[in-house]
Design a protein with these regions (language model features):
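C-terminal regulatory or interaction extensions
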Residues: 1-177
Length: 177
């Protein structure tokens, strides 16, 4: 299915950085997995299926992942003009949304924006200024998820003398050059 193919594409392209603490290993994916899944599920659930020849797109760049869904908000509003904490749930395709809910891909109504933003803010590698961006017009709906690991391509190994463990220290590419 398009959903499973899309989730596979996201998973294959979602690299992980990690750091080791004295007790555990902390994985830090480029994109919070639940946030990316939520974007794809919502793009499929709320797209305008009457736009023949158009489809949901997932485009991955070095610094971001962009989701495009045909058709703007069903209400005609522009998401960038709204308070994301108070956007009412209006489903363009209630049957599709119901099926996705029964398959445990969708949660309660109207929780998508909040879930995506919370997943970013709770990520171990969260940085201010990398908040997800939502944009819509009458033609489509776009979500931009920023790569939380962009610029952290170099890992230097340092040895901690006091306990003999090795810990990965993440260094931005800009710091090395």
């Amino acid at each position: 299915t398009r959903l499973l193919d899309g989730l596979g594409f996201i998973s294959r392209n979602n690299r992980k950085r990690w750091t080791k603490t004295p007790d555990t290993r902390i994985e830090m994916p480029d994109y919070p997995e639940r946030a990316a899944q939520e974007c794809l599920v919502n793009a499929l659930a709320h797209r305008d299926y009457l736009e023949f020849g158009s489809e949901v797109h997932i485009d991955i760049f070095d610094d971001r992942m962009e989701f495009y869904s045909p058709g703007g908000m069903f209400s005609g509003w522009k998401v960038q003009d709204l308070n994301l904490d108070r956007v009412p749930s209006i489903r363009r395709n209630p049957i599709v949304a119901d099926v996705l809910g029964r398959m445990n891909f969708m949660e309660r109504r109207g929780s998508g924006f909040k879930q995506i933003r919370e997943d970013y803010e709770l990520a171990a590698n969260w940085q201010a200024g990398l908040e997800p961006v939502f944009y819509s017009d009458q033609i489509g709906f776009w979500v931009t998820l920023y790569n939380l690991n962009y610029g952290y391509d170099v890992e230097l190994e340092t040895t901690q003398a006091h306990n003999g463990t090795t810990q990965a220290q993440n260094v931005r590419k800009d710091d090395v050059n």
